[in-house]
Amino acid sequence: MAFTLRRAFCHMSVFWMPGAVVALKIHPANNVQKAVRDCLRVWFCSLQPDLFRVRFYHAYCKSFHSENGNDLHPVGEPWFSQAQVWNQPEQTLKNEDEEMLSRRLNSFASFEEVLSFIHTLDTLPVTLASAALLRICEIGKRDDEQRLPKEVLENRVFQALCLRCERDPSHLTNAVLVTVLQSLVIDPQSSLVLSLVAECQRRLRRGSLEVHHLCVLGESLARLQGASCEILKLVICQLQSENLETFAPEDIVSVYRILQACPEEVDKHQTFLNTVNNFSLSIVSYLSPKSISHVLTALVALDQTHARPLLIKLGKSVVRYIPRFTNEELRQVLEAFVYFGHSDRFFTEALEQHVAAQCFSLDPAVASSVMEYCSRKRILSKPIFDVVAEIFVCQSEKFSPSQISELIEPFGKLNYLPPNAPALFRKVENVLFAHLRHFPPKMLLRLLHSCSLIERHPVNFMSKIFSPFFLQRLQGKESYLDRLSLAQMTQLFLTSVLECPFYKGPKLLPKYQVKSFLTPCCSLETPMDLHLYKSVVIGLIDLLGSRLYFASKVLTPYYYTIDVEIKLDEDGFVLPFTVDEDVHTRVALCIDGPQRFCLGSKHLLGKEAIKQRHLRLLGYQVVQVPYHELELLTSRLELVDYLQRKLFSQSSTVHW
């Protein structure tokens, strides 16, 4: 048997190796495998690499399983699996070979290239495995992906790499350790994550992690284990002891994101936050659009309203980057500006250019966010409003109910009708008819009320909103209807009476009608500018001769509050405000401060326009005294002359 085996091997040219033949001659047949194994291994792997790969694939095509479904461990792993081959002590690489392989790894530009290359290796030291993992994570970051895609996480070679590193994380570099943690999207309680976190904790306590690694680790811990993680608290404590001058711009962004994950501890970290806010002023110009949106989002979450210098500087950078923001980043920027009340002319102009350039490709979420920003800041940008109106008419099916509400309400609030107003509101009506049940009651009420502000009265829906069923839905589980909803319902009811006399449907019951539209918390009127009011009162006293001839802040029977009311008899003479008999005409003097107009314009807001419109329909003679006219007056004499022209013009029936 031994002779036959030796002769057969010796007659095969491919087996003609001195080591193998000698081994066969010396050792009996039953020891052939043991004696020849070492000599054949190098030959076998070099001769038939494809056979080795098939065996690797077969071993690692087993399904992976864990109790939580996320552990990167194979079930029923055969003894000759890839991970075990990589772990065999007999297989080592020379330093120069390992350096060459590392250089090749760094030359790859895709996940597939790295994984295919690792697939072909017979030997994989931990250092090379960690380099491969790092390269995979770097490719993900280059593609703007903080987390690795699912197809990579489920790849068998990648899973084998993770298993290799999990078994011996102490050999991983700091960069690999924190980067892999950052890139993995698996269960925080998986054995791989726990192993890597434990190793991070050991290095953290030794103080061997640099600033950048601390920042990456902190972000990963906040994502994986939340703000209550004890290790995260250690990371924050160590970051506070570091010199901010050593932080790269992306590290500062990471600090904000780490603290953002702990909003309940903002008071505890406020001193550190103040230092970071002040230092960040020097790095704003180095921040990418993505980083700027991250910082602004963190400032909102941490309620850093006092960081105005930083916000202003970030706002200037935002102007340059608007075309480069992703839809989500731009939406976050707009939300931050709304939260902090920030706006400037240059940002609005850049936003107008961006919306016009995007036009019909503008994302619905961004379009609604842009409109909400304009609404909150009272910015009447006709280019933006016109484009958005066209987008909605052509692509209304892309918008959700909440986005439709955010899109349409600003038209009413800012008192603007776009050129395609008939088509726009016809489309709104059609959408409401088709999807009315998808609009929550309060959202529907806000939408219909905003339409009425610009004389697009929702007559076809009034019977629905005045019905007991809608009022019940509007109240929901609360014990009462909120004050703002009742005020909007009341104004819609008044609109139906004054502007829609043909409406014959249900009316709003008196018990649901408010007594005044002017309230501190939820007003449908803008409070009077006290500085302007005092100036006008002085002028009126000089003009009329006494304070007895006019009344201030008069609540009418029709829910509106008049700034100044002057009563006239049938001949047009001014009556004392205490007289109720013989009153023929009531003059409503509207002292309109800047808050009653769109920002930086002479265009009245919708709620002020409907008020003046209703007062005229109720028989009042409305005289408007806007701030931009009062600001031109330089003396008390000019003020009196101005009021005289307003009240006693030739076309007026008022007599002095």
Curated annotation (Swiss-Prot):
Q: Which GO terms describe its cellular component?
A: mitochondrial matrix; mitochondrion; ribonucleoprotein granule
Print the keywords alphabetically.
Mitochondrion, Transit peptide
Give any GO molecular function from the UniProt entry: RNA binding
Which domain of life, per UniProt? Eukaryota
Residue span, RAP domain: 587-645
> Where does it localize?
Mitochondrion
**InterPro entries (alphabetical):** FAST_2 (IPR013579), FAST_kinase (IPR050870), FAST_Leu-rich (IPR010622), RAP (IPR013584)
**In which broad location class does this protein mainly occur, judging by the first location in its UniProt entry?**
mitochondrion
Biological-process GO terms, alphabetical: mitochondrial cytochrome c oxidase assembly; mitochondrial RNA processing; positive regulation of mitochondrial translation; regulation of mitochondrial mRNA stability
| Role according to the record | Required for normal mitochondrial respiration. Increases steady-state levels and half-lives of a subset of mature mitochondrial mRNAs MT-ND2, MT-ND3, MT-CYTB, MT-CO2, and MT-ATP8/6. Promotes MT-CO1 mRNA translation and increases mitochondrial complex IV assembly and activity.
Q: Which family does it belong to?
A: Belongs to the FAST kinase family.
Domain comment (free text):
RAP domain is required for FASTKD3 function in mRNA stability and translation.
Protein name, entry field: FAST kinase domain-containing protein 3, mitochondrial
- Organism of derivation: Rattus norvegicus (Rat)
